[in-house]
């Protein structure tokens, strides 16, 4: 009798383990299906916005003191269709690897997950970043109040389509842009202000400036895309 009693006692436990295993499998399958749908939706969105992306446009953040502000700028960059973000990070607050950046919680949270869909590259110094940009034929504009001896212009006076490859720099929250970045820039851009307060924070500045830059370059791209299409029709 004892073996039979032992068997019947084990049977409910066996069923419980089986049900738990089946539950895990069902949850795994459900999770995989959700991930598949999310990827499909992301691919669809990527296809929809592809023609609106501003190629050869980079936003450069120079030595931001708060990592959360990087996330805010990345969010602006992604929403406005800027191609890449470069971060001069002499404090080494960011990981070198892009994949590791995407998994950095503070960046993911403040960028509202935009870091997952944005290309971000870090540099140890301003000089290293400038050398990389110049090697790849990028022209640099810096955002800064009027600087004596430099070419200065108001945001609404600048043609941001004159340079095929353009890098727009944003300085440190308290100290602003560095002298090294200014010296290697083609122009200093300022935002017109009409109040008692004459400054914006990094997130606001990047949003205002990049909106104007991307608006101009997107219209330029659209114009020449239409021209190319007309040319193709004539040659057909």
Which sequence ranges carry the predicted segments?
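Extended, non-globular alpha-helical segments
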Residues: 11-54
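Structural alpha-helical scaffold elements that stabilize or flank donor/cofactor-binding regions
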Residues: 161-162, 181
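Structured adenosyl-cofactor binding patch, chiefly the S-adenosyl-L-methionine
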Residues: 179-235
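RNA substrate-binding interface of SAM-dependent RNA methyltransferases
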Residues: 39-150, 214, 226-229, 233-234
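A structural motif corresponding to the C-terminal end of an alpha-helix
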Residues: 129, 133-136, 177-187
């Amino acid at each position: 009798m004892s073996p039979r009693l032992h068997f019947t006692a084990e049977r409910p436990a066996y069923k419980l383990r089986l049900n738990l295993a089946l539950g895990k499998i069902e949850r795994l399958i459900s999770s995989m299906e959700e991930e598949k749908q999310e990827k499909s939706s992301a691919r669809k969105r990527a296809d929809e916005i592809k023609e609106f992306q501003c190629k050869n446009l980079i936003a450069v953040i120079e030595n931001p003191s708060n990592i959360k502000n990087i996330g805010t700028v990345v969010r602006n960059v992604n929403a406005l269709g800027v191609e890449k973000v470069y971060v001069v990070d002499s404090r080494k607050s960011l990981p070198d690897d892009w994949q590791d950046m995407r998994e950095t919680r503070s960046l993911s949270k403040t960028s509202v997950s935009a870091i997952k869909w944005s290309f971000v590259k870090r540099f140890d110094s301003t000089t290293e970043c400038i050398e990389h940009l110049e090697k790849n034929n990028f022209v640099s504009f810096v955002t800064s109040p009027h600087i004596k001896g430099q070419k200065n212009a108001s945001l609404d006076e600048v043609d941001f389509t004159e340079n095929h490859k353009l890098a727009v720099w944003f300085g440190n929250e308290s100290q602003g842009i560095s002298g090294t970045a200014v010296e290697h820039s083609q122009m200093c851009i300022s935002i017109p202000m009409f109040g008692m307060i004459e400054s914006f924070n990094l997130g606001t500045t990047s949003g205002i400036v990049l909106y104007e830059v991307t608006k101009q370059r997107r219209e330029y791209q659209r114009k020449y895309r239409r021209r190319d299409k007309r040319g193709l029709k004539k040659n057909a």
